Amino acid sequence: YKAAEGYYAKALEISERLTEKFPEDPNLQRDLSSLYNDLGDIAKAMNDYKAAEGYYAKTLEISEKLAEKYPEDPQMQRDLSASYNKLGGIAEALNDYNAAEGYYAKDLEISEKLAEKYPDDPNLQRGLSISYNKLGGIAKARNDYNAAEGDYAKALAIRERLAEKYPEDPELQRGRSISYINLGDIAKALNDYTAAEGYYAKALEISKRLAEKYPDDPNLQRDLSISYNKLGDIAEALNDYKAAEGYYAKA
């Protein structure tokens, strides 16, 4: 990360000089915003959340100006949405759930407008599902399981439509599996083990297919392990130790 940070910092110097010289060029402004975002990602990866927050705040500042100046440009609006999302992630990592919720709500507002305006754009639809998912995560962290369930269900509905429309896209299939896991976690927290088992079983079905199709993808293999583990937890909660042992062994 240190080497990457050095390269990005040098690129940032050049980008800052260019935007100072040509302040009206939106592409140069967007490049500058992107570099702040990259440096924020590096800082976050090194667990330096304060530095990350500073970089993401600079990204947001530029994104807000561009989105205001070019309200009909979906990319500028999407950049703004992503900036709120990144700051929400930092606030969440710092356990500041109020701030995180505020950022994620702004992200959702933009994502909803874009998804409504461009219903056939899978990336914008996927972005909307992620926005719901993020808010669901905050509600879950606060033990507001009803709100979490509502947000996760909205995310799942979008992901199911996308997975049906693009059956060969592994990321869209994976998103669906993650939604089932999230809903299973909520059902488990509410002690509804039958519902939880049903959700986890659906996640397992998808994870199995993906892990088989992409045996060299570590994330998909990990997803499969998580699915088995979750089903093991349910079996254990139901005192079915034989089944639990079987699931844990596969995990």
Model regions: which residues?
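Thr-biased low-complexity repeat/linker tracts and other Thr-enriched repetitive architectures
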Residues: Y1-A251
